[in-house]
């Protein structure tokens, strides 16, 4: 199993009772996670001093409760910069566990000894797109959501990769 342990700006701090406590840069968020089935004490002080909490509705969906959280902020993974903003269905705009995949294919791209082209489908906000572009690949980023494509362009600009994907 690969572990995404190279993050400096993201960590899972604790988890219990269907929720996880995460640090995204300097902000602490509580989000539901159906995989968290254990019921351990929520002793970490972050549970009480969170910046945002996504509350799932019994009817489906849910909503964010913001305690002290900007509309948008940035986190970094190695040389990449991501713009985060909580939006519907508990998302923040990034799946940090995917960093292991980014590292794997970035190494393959750098060591290929030839030009590499990548087609990133369902590309969301561009984590994989940016990692491949930063490693030297020519990338085509495709997502059905115009908003996600715009967000990926923002992330590319923040990472100094506007001319790449």
Predicted regions and their residues:
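Conserved class I S-adenosyl-L-methionine
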Residues: 115-124
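Short beta-strand "acidic-cap" motif of Rossmann-like dinucleotide-binding folds
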Residues: 141
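A generic local secondary-structure boundary/capping motif
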Residues: 18-19, 109, 128-129
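Conserved SAM-binding loop of SAM-dependent methyltransferases across substrates and taxa
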Residues: 125-138
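Non-catalytic substrate-recognition/targeting regions of SAM-dependent transferases
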Residues: 6-22, 29-96, 103
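Conserved alpha-helix/loop element of class I SAM-dependent methyltransferases that forms part
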Residues: 96-113
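N-terminal accessory targeting/assembly segments
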Residues: 1-4
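S-adenosyl-L-methionine
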Residues: 145-165
């Amino acid at each position: 199993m690969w572990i995404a342990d190279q993050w400096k700006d993201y960590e899972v701090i604790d988890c219990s009772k269907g929720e996880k406590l995460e640090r995204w840069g300097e902000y602490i968020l509580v989000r539901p996670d159906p995989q968290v089935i254990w019921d351990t004490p929520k002793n970490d002080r972050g549970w009480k001093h969170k910046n945002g909490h996504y509350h799932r509705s019994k009817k489906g969906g849910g909503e964010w409760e913001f305690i002290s959280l900007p509309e948008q902020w940035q986190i970094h993974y190695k040389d990449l910069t991501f713009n985060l903003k909580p939006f519907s269905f508990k998302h923040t705009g990034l799946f940090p566990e995917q960093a292991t995949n980014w590292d794997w294919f970035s190494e393959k791209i750098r060591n290929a000894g030839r030009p590499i082209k990548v087609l990133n489908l369902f590309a969301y906000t561009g984590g994989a797109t940016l990692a491949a572009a930063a490693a030297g690949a020519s990338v085509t980023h495709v997502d059905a959501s115009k908003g996600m494509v715009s967000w990926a362009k923002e992330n590319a600009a923040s990472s100094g990769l506007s001319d790449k994907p």
